[in-house]
């Protein structure tokens, strides 16, 4: 339930005073952070097609894509602060949203509509649900017609700028 608050003791049980905690840390770092970094660094452009709920880890997976197209009924949320967690492992919130909006997004844990996500620059396009697949495929086809080397070098350059701004310093 998106509106439910969670007892932190429940979450802490899985993460404190347990043998093999180092294994859990390494596993989470690999499964979440490193996986996201590898997806982000794929040389070819990637597009997230979002409809419905995009919550916590869903945001993490969408944000590593180069472009995000959302249906008008989509929403984004990250209620993990209510669980006593400071965000998902791939903590890109202040890069995807400006820092003040990222704080609002996390502190309140409320849903952000696709329209607001577009206004904040998190989403490239918002389209009717019935048009989502068509519009996404059309964009992918246009990109696929571009010279590969130019796309790869452009993506690397923009990712490098994000890294210089601190995105590469994200860690668990």
Go through the PLM ranges and name each one:
Residues 1-34:
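Glycine- (often His-adjacent) and acidic-residue-rich active-site loop
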Residues 37-151:
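Crotonase-fold acyl-CoA enzyme core
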Residues 137, 162-163:
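Short, solvent-exposed polar/charged micro-motifs at secondary-structure junctions
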Residues 164-168:
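Short beta-strand->loop
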Residues 170-172:
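Conserved small/polar residues in nucleotide/adenosyl-binding loops
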